[in-house]
């Protein structure tokens, strides 16, 4: 079907001509922004939503600590805490991430400067950015509030996420990664369920990508975790590229489909407990690892084996076969899609262009799925008065 010529995006400058977070000449900025947005292939609904977000954003002005009122905590991780806040001057509800860093003023200023690139990241698949500032030893990053939270939170409520839903997630992640790469020459560097956000309108967006090299370096010492989504080449310290993000997406999809972090892979007994039936396939053939004396049983999922120490886990990712989806419960297309994401050699791993034309993505794109309805019933959210079908995302 031929694509309709997109309607020009309508952005009206803020009436008082005020600067958007320190940027001046609003008129010129808006013209440039309008041009950039018209290059994106947006449908009518996406266009209207981006327009509405950017028009709201113009009312925000300079962000200051005193202008925020805390509503609730949304989550913690990645070196920071995220709060749902009200921005009193504009009345907007935002997500505010606070990152505490002991750093020199010059480094701090560089981080704030580097984060300004986020003002340029306008896509239906990327969380909207209001601005960043420093106050009282903390860097604040203010973003669009996504009322469905992150997919790791959704997974906890859902137990497992259905394949049809993960099809829509895959499309959004691929389009988000493609946008970052093609329009901004940046890779995400941290694709995982907690960095994929969703909302009651059925939107799926990436957040927390590596736009500030200085912030990545400053936070490098704060890595604490029991799971890793990093690719084998990245863990080995060799050169890595956007192919590394594709591995992370594949690993995240297996986790969300099966209902637990997939390393070490579940054995036949655990798969039977997870899916309520006997499951065929390689994922079920892994012999149980010997249990270290005195190590506690894992409370994660239904695995009776001890939790891996982080060095064991990283060694497993680098040296053992990659995770797979068990056969018999998922379509062959989905299994093949995941396998192509989880090839250990990055040169052989599928790239974004190949994944976009994969049979699983083509099928998922054509499917009518009420993503918003599924999300709202799963996590107990009220659906907006005009529900969104993810097919139109």
From Swiss-Prot:
Fetch the InterPro entries from UniProt. Kinase-like_dom_sf (IPR011009), MAP_kinase_kinase (IPR050915), Prot_kinase_dom (IPR000719), Protein_kinase_ATP_BS (IPR017441), Ser/Thr_kinase_AS (IPR008271)
Q: Which Gene3D superfamilies match?
A: Phosphorylase Kinase, domain 1, Transferase(Phosphotransferase) domain 1
Report residue spans for region: Disordered.
Answer: 1-27
Sites of the modification Phosphothreonine?
A: 286, 292
From the UniProt annotation, give the residues forming the signal peptide: none
Name one matching Pfam family.
Answer: Pkinase
Phosphoserine PTM positions? 218, 222, 298
Biological process GO annotation list?
Answer: Bergmann glial cell differentiation; cell motility; cellular senescence; central nervous system neuron differentiation; cerebellar cortex formation; endodermal cell differentiation; epithelial cell proliferation involved in lung morphogenesis; ERBB2-ERBB3 signaling pathway
Annotated Protein kinase domain residues: 68-361
Q: What is its main location?
A: cytoplasm
Topology versus the membrane, per the UniProt entry? Peripheral membrane protein
Please name the CDD domains in this protein's record. Answer: PKc_MEK1
- UniProt EC number: 2.7.12.2
Q: Where is the active site?
A: 190 (proton acceptor)
List where in the cell it is found.
Cytoplasm, Cytoskeleton, Microtubule organizing center, Centrosome; Cytoplasm, Cytoskeleton, Microtubule organizing center, Spindle pole body; Cytoplasm; Nucleus
What molecular function does GO assign, one term? mitogen-activated protein kinase kinase kinase binding
The GO cellular component terms are: axon; cell cortex; centrosome; ciliary basal body; cytosol; dendrite; dendrite cytoplasm; early endosome
Activity regulation details: Ras proteins such as HRAS mediate the activation of RAF proteins such as RAF1 or BRAF which in turn activate extracellular signal-regulated kinases (ERK) through MAPK (mitogen-activated protein kinases) and ERK kinases MAP2K1/MEK1 and MAP2K2/MEK2. Activation occurs through phosphorylation of Ser-218 and Ser-222. MAP2K1/MEK1 binds KSR1 or KSR2 releasing the inhibitory intramolecular interaction between KSR1 or KSR2 protein kinase and N-terminal domains. This allows KSR1 or KSR2 dimerization with BRAF leading to BRAF activation and phosphorylation of MAP2K1.
Quick one: where's region RAF1-binding?
Answer: 270-307
Keyword entries, A-Z: ATP-binding, Cytoplasm, Cytoskeleton, Kinase, Membrane, Nucleotide-binding, Nucleus, Phosphoprotein, Serine/threonine-protein kinase, Transferase, Tyrosine-protein kinase
Q: How does it assemble?
A: Found in a complex with at least BRAF, HRAS, MAP2K1, MAPK3/ERK1 and RGS14. Forms a heterodimer with MAP2K2/MEK2. Forms heterodimers with KSR2 which further dimerize to form tetramers. Interacts with KSR1 or KSR2 and BRAF; the interaction with KSR1 or KSR2 mediates KSR1-BRAF or KSR2-BRAF dimerization. Interacts with ARBB2, LAMTOR3, MAPK1/ERK2 and RAF1. Interacts with MAPK1/ERK2. Interacts with MORG1. Interacts with PPARG. Interacts with VRK2. Interacts with SGK1. Interacts with BIRC6/bruce. Interacts with KAT7; the interaction promotes KAT7 phosphorylation.
Q: Which family does it belong to?
A: Belongs to the protein kinase superfamily. STE Ser/Thr protein kinase family. MAP kinase kinase subfamily.
What role is this protein assigned?
Answer: Dual specificity protein kinase which acts as an essential component of the MAP kinase signal transduction pathway. Binding of extracellular ligands such as growth factors, cytokines and hormones to their cell-surface receptors activates RAS and this initiates RAF1 activation. RAF1 then further activates the dual-specificity protein kinases MAP2K1/MEK1 and MAP2K2/MEK2.
Under which name does UniProt file this protein?
Answer: Dual specificity mitogen-activated protein kinase kinase 1
Q: Which organism is it from?
A: Rattus norvegicus
């Amino acid at each position: 079907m031929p694509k309709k010529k997109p309607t020009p995006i309508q952005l009206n400058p803020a009436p008082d001509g005020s600067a958007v977070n320190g940027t001046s000449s609003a008129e010129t900025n808006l013209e440039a922004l309008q041009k950039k947005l018209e290059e994106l292939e947006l449908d009518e609904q996406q266009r209207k939503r981006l327009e509405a977000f950017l028009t709201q954003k113009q009312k925000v002005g300079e962000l200051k600590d005193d202008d925020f009122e805390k509503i609730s905590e949304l989550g913690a991780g990645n070196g920071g805490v995220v709060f749902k806040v009200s921005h009193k001057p504009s009345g907007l509800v935002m997500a505010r991430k606070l990152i505490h860093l002991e750093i020199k003023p010059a480094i701090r200023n560089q981080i704030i400067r580097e984060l300004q690139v986020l003002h340029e990241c306008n896509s239906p698949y990327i969380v909207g950015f209001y601005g960043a500032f420093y106050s009282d030893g903390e860097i604040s990053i203010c973003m669009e509030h996504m009322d469905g939270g992150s997919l790791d939170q959704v997974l906890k409520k859902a137990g497992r996420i259905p394949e049809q839903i993960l099809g829509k997630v895959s499309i959004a992640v691929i389009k988000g990664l493609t946008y970052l790469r093609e329009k901004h020459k940046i890779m995400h560097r941290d694709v995982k369920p907690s960095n994929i956000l969703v909302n009651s309108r059925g939107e799926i967006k990436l957040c927390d990508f590596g736009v500030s090299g200085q912030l990545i370096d400053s936070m490098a010492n704060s890595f604490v975790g029991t799971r890793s989504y990093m690719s084998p080449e990245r863990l080995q310290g060799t050169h890595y590229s956007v192919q590394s993000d594709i591995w992370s997406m594949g690993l995240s999809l297996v986790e969300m489909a099966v209902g637990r972090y997939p390393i070490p892979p579940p054995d036949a007994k655990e798969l039977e407990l997870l899916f309520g039936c006997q499951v065929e396939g390689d994922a079920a053939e892994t012999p149980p690892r010997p249990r270290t004396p005195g190590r506690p049983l894992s409370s994660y999922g239904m695995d009776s084996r001890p939790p891996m120490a982080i060095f064991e886990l990283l060694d497993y990712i680098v040296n053992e076969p990659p995770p797979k989806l068990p056969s018999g419960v998922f379509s062959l297309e989905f299994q093949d899609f995941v396998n192509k994401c989880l090839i250990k050699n990055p040169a052989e791993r599928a790239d974004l262009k190949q994944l976009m034309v994969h049979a699983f993505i083509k099928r998922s794109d054509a499917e009518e799925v009420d993503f918003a309805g599924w999300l709202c019933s799963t996590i107990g959210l009220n659906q907006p008065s005009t529900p969104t079908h993810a097919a139109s995302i």
